[in-house]
Every structure is written in structure tokens, then in C-alpha cells.
Amino acid sequence: MKKFIGILVLGFLVCTNINAENIRHTYFAGGCFWCMEESFEKAIGVQEVISGYSGGDLPNPTYKEVTYKNTGHFETIKIIYDQNKINFEDLLNLYWTNIDPFDAAGQFCDKGLSYRSVIFYQNNLQKQLVEKSIKNIEKKFNGEKVVTFIRKFEKFYPAENYHQDYYKESFVNYLMYKKACDRAEQLKKIWQ
């Protein structure tokens, strides 16, 4: 029995190491991180999405600090994905269709700096892909200026536990919030 369990554990570790080589992270801010988390967790190849904060200087910020104080942080999601199943460009395209790239005040019913849209790039290739996608969107929308920030990624702080998987864990409250914000209808109007 011990030998059998040892073989199972070894097999698991080998598989995990093989998969770990294909795992990547990327970071997007798009207003309410609950809504962003829901959209990205449904994408094939995405293994996990974590709600959190990025872009500011305050270490380990809380939701109240990010929302009500000038921390410089944005509500951000960390996307953990298998690059063999979905790549950065695919995630970038999904990102655009889940935000209003022309809203400089925030996103939908959430206004303020912490709700602004931001793409955090990790290397020059990602930065170039983001810049190219912005040009394509501005062309598609007859020159309307995209106001989404492009920032170099520095640090990510996970949000409090009650924010994680909020759309699943607090399903009724989340649906009421989402309906009140009319996010889905507004996205349809922008991207149809």
C-alpha cells in the first residue's frame, strides 16, 4: 500500500512540474474585481483568478484604504493561466470586452481612481501587444481615445477573503449589484 501511495504522489509531482512550466500570471484592473473575476474564471485555460490590489505604494492595503484613501492602488485581478491553452493576447481581447475603455472616471457604477481600468504589463512584448490593441480599438471606434492606463507591473496584494470568488460565494448579493450597475447591458452597447 505504501508503495502504491508513493507512486501516486510521484506521478502527481511529475505532472505538476510539467504543468508548472506552462503557468503564467497576468494582472488587469477593470473596475469591480468581482465582475472581472467572474468573466475570466470562465475562460478555458484560466486556472484561477484572485481579486486584489495593485499599482500603489501602500503595502498590504485593505479594501477600505484602497476605496477611501489615496493609496494609488486599483482593484486588480491576478489571472493564473496555462499558456498552452490561452495566451496573453487572448486574455487581452477578453479584457477589452469586459470594460469600458473610454471611461476616465471608473467603470460603470463604480467611480474613483481605484476603479479605473489598467493593464499591468510584465515585459516589452506585452507592452507592445497592449499598445497595438489600443490603436486597433481607437481605429474601430473612429478615433475615440482609450483612457485605460498601461503600467509596468510591480506588486500584487490579494484582497480580503470575503472578496475572493464573491460572485459564487455571495451569489444573490452579487447579482443584485451587477443588475444595479447594468454592467452587462452597457458592455453590449459598447462592443456590439
Predicted regions and their residues:
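Bacterial N-terminal signal peptides
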Residues: 5-15
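Flexible coil/turn and secondary-structure edge motifs
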Residues: 18-192
